């Protein structure tokens, strides 16, 4: 087991950071490669624990996978149609194997998934979508089992609620369905758009991605192709917040402002100077006063729930108060008690947190509770007075590619240490 040991400083975090590919696009794209009868190459895939788990799962299913810069996948000889519990238990994204398996092979089963403990994220919407495409679904022995005689059938589907995961499942499965599928009330996130671009690169006919109505014209087979994963907008936002709360200046490279317009608008409202070009975003907080902002999470293009914890920290350190309202997940304020251990000011009322006017943070031993919350603890440690130990950093490794190296390049004093060394 590893932990982060951070020596806090009042020195601003400043410099350049290269943003990795988006985890939330890379994972569905890697699973969607199961649809392809010929080899595919996926570039700009981040080096993350969840990516490693996905690659191992694809290999268990019979795909040939290698990584040499890009990830190369040959799913032409897939011969196992079951995603087992020992892999799925660590990663909720494993459910994305089900749609491609049943669409291409007529059958598939996936153990009920695990992942971050941030509330109920049931697979009901995935199941209902596949059933509307003609699949028969059973829940047996802890597995979701899907079958279809012949091909799936295109359908007009109206999602009961906006769901990124279920939108991806239905969109991928419908590519090999007979006929046209119209998916209404679809999620609009950039990662869904990127997954659709990958599907089209291997021969699918997907249109309307990025709107709430996606149209998929089914084809008989999908071939091979090349795709480069879109930049990680959440990693981008995380480093921009790190600069903002430390009074620094950072340039994020290999990313695009169009991916996180709602986040950039709130950073400007908080007092930061934000500029951008074709493939970079800069934030300058030098000599500026940090002001608390009101945040309400909602599906894209509104403010993303995955940036909520980082802005909770920003509000705590700003001239406040600022109100954070979480509408996507329940139980997503687990980072607040940990930040309070460091001296942060916040009050929680249901799905709302009121925070601001914290007079500095003090280093403490804190525990990462989920992926994005853990990032806020790491940033807090960088700006706190004294030493901070962040435990259970495997959560961070699920979504951030070498976060300690990138923070070190910005001037942070952070190291990964074995628990036995502390």
Curated annotation (Swiss-Prot):
A GO term, aspect molecular function: UDP-N-acetylglucosamine 1-carboxyvinyltransferase activity
Active site location: 116
InterPro entries: Enolpyruvate_Tfrase_dom, Enolpyruvate_Tfrase_sf, MurA_subfamily, RNA3'P_cycl/enolpyr_Trfase_a/b, UDP_GlcNAc_COvinyl_MurA
Cited SUPFAM superfamilies: EPT/RTPC-like
EC number annotated for this UniProt entry: 2.5.1.7
Positions where 2-(S-cysteinyl)pyruvic acid O-phosphothioketal occurs in the chain: 116
UniProt: UDP-N-acetyl-alpha-D-glucosamine binding residues: 92, 121-125, 161-164, 306, 328
Pathway, per record: Cell wall biogenesis; peptidoglycan biosynthesis
Any one annotated GO CC term: cytoplasm
Cellular localisation: Cytoplasm
CDD domains xref list: UdpNAET
Binding sites annotated in the UniProt record for phosphoenolpyruvate: 23-24
Keyword Cell division in annotation: yes
GO biological process: cell division; cell wall organization; peptidoglycan biosynthetic process; regulation of cell shape; UDP-N-acetylgalactosamine biosynthetic process
Annotated keywords: Cell cycle, Cell division, Cell shape, Cell wall biogenesis/degradation, Cytoplasm, Peptidoglycan synthesis, Pyruvate, Transferase
Reactions it catalyzes: phosphoenolpyruvate + UDP-N-acetyl-alpha-D-glucosamine = UDP-N-acetyl-3-O-(1-carboxyvinyl)-alpha-D-glucosamine + phosphate
Catalytic EC class: transferase
Function (record text): Cell wall formation. Adds enolpyruvyl to UDP-N-acetylglucosamine.
HAMAP family reported for this sequence: MurA
Family under the similarity heading: Belongs to the EPSP synthase family. MurA subfamily.
Name listed for the protein in its UniProt record: UDP-N-acetylglucosamine 1-carboxyvinyltransferase
Organism from which the protein derives: Aliivibrio salmonicida (strain LFI1238) (Vibrio salmonicida (strain LFI1238))
């Amino acid at each position: 087991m590893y932990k982060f040991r951070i020596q806090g400083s009042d020195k601003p975090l400043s410099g350049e950071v290269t943003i990795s590919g988006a985890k939330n696009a890379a994972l569905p794209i890697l699973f969607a490669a199961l649809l392809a009868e010929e080899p595919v190459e996926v570039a700009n895939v981040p080096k993350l624990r969840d990516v490693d788990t996905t690659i191992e799962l694809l290999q268990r299913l019979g795909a040939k996978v290698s990584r040499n810069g890009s990830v190369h996948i040959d799913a032409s000889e897939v011969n196992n149609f079951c995603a087992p519990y020992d892999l799925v238990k660590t990663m909720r994204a494993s459910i994305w194997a089900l749609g491609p398996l049943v669409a291409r092979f007529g059958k598939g089963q996936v153990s009920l998934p695990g992942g971050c403990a941030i509330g109920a994220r049931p697979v009901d919407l995935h199941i209902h979508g596949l059933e509307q495409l003609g699949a028969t679904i059973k829940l047996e022995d802890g597995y979701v089992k899907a079958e279809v005689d012949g091909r799936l059938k295109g359908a007009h589907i109206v999602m009961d609620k906006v769901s990124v995961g279920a939108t991806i499942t239905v969109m991928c499965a419908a590519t090999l369905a007979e006929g046209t599928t119209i998916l209404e009330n679809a999620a609009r996130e950039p990662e869904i758009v990127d997954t659709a671009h990958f599907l089209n690169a291997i021969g699918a006919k997907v249109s309307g991605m990025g709107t709430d109505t996606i149209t998929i014209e089914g084809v008989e087979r999908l071939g091979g192709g090349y795709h480069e994963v879109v930049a990680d907008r959440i990693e981008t936002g995380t480093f921009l917040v790190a600069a903002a709360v430390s009074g620094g200046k950072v340039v994020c490279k290999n990313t695009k402002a169009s991916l996180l317009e709602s986040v950039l608008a709130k950073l400007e409202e908080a007092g930061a100077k934000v500029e951008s070009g074709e493939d970079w975003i800069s934030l300058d907080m030098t000599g500026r006063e940090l002001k608390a902002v009101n945040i309400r999470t909602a599906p894209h293009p509104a403010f993303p729930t995955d940036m909520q914890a980082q802005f909770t920290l920003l509000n705590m350190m700003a001239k406040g108060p600022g109100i954070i309202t979480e509408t996507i997940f329940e139980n997503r304020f687990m980072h607040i008690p940990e930040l309070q251990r460091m001296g942060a000011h916040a009050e929680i009322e249901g799905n709302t947190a009121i925070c601001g006017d914290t007079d500095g943070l003090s280093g403490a031993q804190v525990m990462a509770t989920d992926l994005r919350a853990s990032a806020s603890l790491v940033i807090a440690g960088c700006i706190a007075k004294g030493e901070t130990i962040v435990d259970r950093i495997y959560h961070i490794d699920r979504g951030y590619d070498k976060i300690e190296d990138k923070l070190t390049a910005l001037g942070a004093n952070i190291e990964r240490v074995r628990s036995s060394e502390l």
